[in-house]
Amino acid sequence: MDLPGPIHDFILVFLGSGLILGGLGVVLFTNPIYSAFSLGLVLVCISLFYILSNSHFVAAAQLLIYVGAVNVLIIFAVMFMNGSDYSKDFQLNLWTIGDGLTSLVCTSIFFSLITTILDTSWYGIIWTTRANQIIEQDLISNSQQIGIHLSTDFFLPFELVSIILLVALIGAIAVARQ
């Protein structure tokens, strides 16, 4: 998106703070409905980040798939749960071994990510601007590049994901029949 520098920076900071607050809401809210809506906020902020980086196709896919389908499915699943079932579990706020192990794993992943970011040489990356665009294939749009990569470089993972989705669909139909 071609915005002036200060406006772009303000929107970037606003979306980043929305992303951080939404992520904290997902983890810290004891009510699963509030957590699901916070997850929706996180996914919308990610989609808006894609719009800011001129990846409109990925932003539309993010909105349609994750916000429009997955998050709505999570909200429906939480709404179908009995309210007394999950409210009893959250009244006792003691840490268990699983909570400690999970926080240890997440902290180690976070520090390894920070170490990787700091150790990476970012000078080899070609930064593009509006005046000096460096694009490999000028005539191919973003969605065509995604299609080319999915059918060549990422063919096997793409097919594995389709098989996993097919198995999940068959499993959902089998559970619904019972």
From Swiss-Prot:
One GO term describing the cellular component: chloroplast thylakoid membrane
Bilayer disposition of the protein: Multi-pass membrane protein
Catalysed reaction, written as an equation: a plastoquinone + NADH + (n+1) H(+)(in) = a plastoquinol + NAD(+) + n H(+)(out); a plastoquinone + NADPH + (n+1) H(+)(in) = a plastoquinol + NADP(+) + n H(+)(out)
Keyword Transcription regulation: no
A Pfam family hit: Oxidored_q3
EC number: 7.1.1.-
Highest taxon of source: Eukaryota
Main location (coarse class): plastid
Enzyme class at the top of the EC tree: translocase
InterPro entries, per database record: NAD(P)H-Q_Oxidoreduct_6, NADH_UbQ/plastoQ_OxRdtase_su6, Nuo/plastoQ_OxRdtase_6_NuoJ
Bilayer-spanning residue ranges: 10-30, 32-52, 61-81, 94-114, 154-174
Intracellular or extracellular location(s): Plastid, Chloroplast thylakoid membrane
Annotated keywords: Chloroplast, Membrane, NAD, NADP, Plastid, Plastoquinone, Quinone, Thylakoid, Translocase, Transmembrane, Transmembrane helix, Transport
Family affiliation: Belongs to the complex I subunit 6 family.
Description of how the protein assembles with itself and partners: NDH is composed of at least 16 different subunits, 5 of which are encoded in the nucleus.
Functional note: NDH shuttles electrons from NAD(P)H:plastoquinone, via FMN and iron-sulfur (Fe-S) centers, to quinones in the photosynthetic chain and possibly in a chloroplast respiratory chain. The immediate electron acceptor for the enzyme in this species is believed to be plastoquinone. Couples the redox reaction to proton translocation, and thus conserves the redox energy in a proton gradient.
Listed name of the protein: NAD(P)H-quinone oxidoreductase subunit 6, chloroplastic
Source organism: Citrus sinensis
